[in-house]
Design a protein with these regions (language model features):
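Bacterial N-terminal signal peptides
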Residues: 11-22
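Activation targets extended, charge/polar-rich intrinsically disordered C-terminal tails
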Residues: 103-109, 119, 134, 138-210, ...
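Catalytic glutamate of the conserved HExxH
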Residues: 123-135
Length: 653
């Protein structure tokens, strides 16, 4: 107890000193050490420092109440432009001659800011930001919150939600919880506001030095906030954050207001590049795929649905009927070797990336193939919150390269983080759960979703708030066939488990209604056989039998190339190389369109090669299963047409 009291007194004294400094009002003064410098060197250096000061926000200059010594040093590493300790700003003396003769404005460095002069100017701004960050420039409300939360943190093991991330703060910006949200040091689930140690927003970074730690992130981003007019469009949330903090913003470009994304759908005939336009998004839903008995699926799958209005339709409830335009945001373990290993999922060996998919594909994937239902419940978001969320979605899509853990960083955790970081109000809600159904319950408990849309099952189906598993439909069809044909099987699963020959034995006895039911069931059997064939090919292709693997030949090469080349669908930044950062801007859209179309055409060609070759690679049992099921479909179709004609119906072709 005495130790805790002592720590409390020590913390209060330190905080009081910091608050006193933060409240002081004085002008920044950069004091050049002129010893050993010629008049020309002094003049050129002073012009550089004056140029930097003109760029700084007024609040920044007023809050730094100290004289900061500036001197040229010969002791810095050759590649370093400068550095700052707690008292001095040092610049690399090797850069002084070109500053004096003006050639630094023409020397291209290959670094993010271009010329040597711009890099040197950025260095001064960067290092001054470290001084400002240490100054604890807080508003009175922030000071009071930090003071009260800091005291609680030293006297209690449990902090209220508003204090998480506030207790023990020591910096103006770099330990602000909202800054950390936007920067990419995401909150951990069930860890009372603790943060991930790594920042995984590494794609489309202007300078990977920024993810070293939050202090460097703030300093690097201040460079671009002050020097790059496109920063407001490339990193709009951070630009607003800095502008709000300083009560000031430099001039910046007008932003296009929509964000490109790569469509990760499996139809290679569709345009690969799409656009997230906040003006066309009516609502955002939490989309839950219900669980099944599979070990990786028993708790469901968390996704988010964008209710996108058809072109020309006014934004409103009718947009819910424009299903062909709706999109799904789904975090998945992108498996570039097509192998789903529970062990690798537990150890984080899979990358985790945000896929943007057409709703129709997702509905088919879950309801028809996996036989799982979907629930789609609207999130209670305002129009500005929807716009902020879409902006964050685009940022994650282009920049995030996470690690997928089935328990601690799965689809539910990633979806929670997207909501937490994308909508400031949701960051204040305690939603940190680790299962998809748990996230649904948390959203419902916090009154953040409207689950009343599910109260009337028929209306929920009609309006697209629910998509039933085809299992119920298949069971209903099987019930029709069982009653009419006196089938011995108890349920649809038992019927589908029969061989194609065993199912065929019942076809000739079927009347019109039973034949229609059997046709739908045979289509389900065919989808199941295709899935089993794909699984067999995957297991053999990835297996250890070299002789077996060698049989893949041309098809194996196509499969391997598809797996390699489709990686850009989950990491779209690959299409733009190393130029640019943040959200792609109009000047990059043409390259993005051309490169994505080129990649997609190549994938389409590879897919055709694979389709033509792959059936011969199946085991005789799998190949026969597909062939016989296709024959069953032809036979049932012919039988159904004959029965329909005999009953006086229209002749079906």
């Amino acid at each position: 107890v005495n130790n805790r009291a002592g720590r409390l007194r020590q913390w209060l004294v330190g905080l009081a000193a910091g608050l006193a400094l933060g409240g002081a009002q004085a002008a920044l003064h950069l004091e050049l050490d002129t010893q050993g410098l010629t008049p020309a060197q002094i003049q050129a250096t002073q012009q550089l420092l004056d140029e930097a000061q003109v760029l700084l926000p007024p609040k920044f200059k007023a809050a730094l109440d100290e004289r900061i010594p500036v001197r040229w040093s010969s002791e810095l590493l050759e590649e370093a432009y400068g550095e700052a300790d707690r008292r001095n700003l040092l610049l690399n003396r090797r850069l002084l001659p070109s500053l004096v003769d003006g050639s630094d404005t023409r020397i291209q460095t290959g670094r993010p800011h271009g010329t040597q002069h711009r890099e040197l100017l950025a260095t001064v701004l960067h290092e001054l930001t470290h001084f400002y960050d240490r100054e604890r420039v807080w508003t009175p409300e922030q000071r009071q919150l930090i003071l009260s939360c800091g005291g609680l943190g030293l006297t209690s093991d449990q902090l209220p939600l508003k204090c998480q991330g506030q207790a023990g703060r020591s910096y103006t910006l770099s330990d602000d919880p909202r800054l950390l949200d936007l920067a990419g040091w995401q909150v951990k689930t069930r860890k009372h506001g603790n943060r991930e140690s790594k920042n995984l927003f590494i794609a489309r970074s202007p300078d990977l030095y920024e993810v070293t730690n939050p202090k460097e992130f703030v300093a690097v981003n201040m460079e671009y906030f002050l020097l790059d007019p496109s920063y407001a469009c490339r990193r709009p949330a951070l630009q607003r954050y800095f502008a709000e903090h300083f009560g000031w913003s430099p001039a910046h470009d007008a932003c296009p207001g929509r964000y490109p994304y790569l469509n990760a759908g499996n139809d290679f005939g569709e345009a690969p590049l799409g656009w997230l336009d906040p003006e066309r998004v009516y609502a955002v839903d939490y989309l839950l795929a219900e669980g099944n008995e599979q070990v990786m699926s028993r708790w469901g799958h968390s996704m988010l649905r964008l209710v996108v209005c058809a072109p020309g339709r006014p934004r409103g409830p009718d947009c819910r009927l424009d299903l062909q335009y709706h999109l799904v945001l789904s975090f998945r373990a992108f498996v570039n070797d097509v192998q789903l290993s529970s062990w690798r999922g537990l150890t984080g060996s899979y990358p985790s990336r945000l896929f943007v998919l057409p709703l129709a594909q997702v509905v088919d994937e879950y309801t028809k193939v996996e036989l799982r239902g979907l629930q789609s419940v609207p999130l209670k978001l305002t129009r500005p919150e929807i716009a902020d969320f879409l902006e964050r979605t685009a940022q994650v899509h282009w920049s995030y390269d996470g690690q997928y853990y089935f328990v601690t960083n799965n689809c539910a955790v990633e979806t929670f983080k997207l909501l937490h970081d994308g909508v400031a109000r949701l960051a204040a809600a305690q939603l940190d759960v680790i299962t998809p159904t748990g996230l649904m319950d948390a959203l419902r408990f916090k009154d953040l979703v409207d689950t009343s849309v599910l109260d009337d099952p028929r209306e929920a189906l009609r309006l697209g708030y629910r998509f039933d598993s085809f299992r119920e439909r298949f069971q209903a069809m099987f019930k029709v066939a069982r009653e009419r044909l006196k089938l011995p099987q108890a349920d649809v699963e038992a019927w589908l488990a029969l061989t194609p020959q065993q199912r065929r034995e019942q076809f000739q006895r079927a009347d019109l209604r039973a034949s229609a039911a059997l046709l739908l069931l045979e289509q389900a059997a065919y989808r199941r056989a295709l899935l089993q064939a794909q699984t067999e090919l995957k297991d053999r292709y990835l297996g250890e039998d070299a002789v077996d693997k060698a049989r893949f030949g041309k098809a194996g090469g196509a499969l391997e190339q598809i797996l390699k080349d489709s990686g850009y669908l989950s990491r779209p930044a690959e299409l733009l190389g190393t130029d640019g950062y943040g959200l792609p801007q109009p000047g990059e859209w043409e390259q993005l369109t051309a490169e994505s179309q080129k990649r997609q055409a190549h994938l389409r060609s590879l897919r055709d090669t694979l389709n033509n070759e792959v059936r011969q690679l199946l085991s005789p049992e799998a190949r026969d299963g597909l062939d016989l099921t296709e024959a069953n479909l032809d036979l049932l179709g012919k039988h159904l047409r004959e029965l329909n004609k005999a009953s006086g119906g229209l002749e079906l072709k």
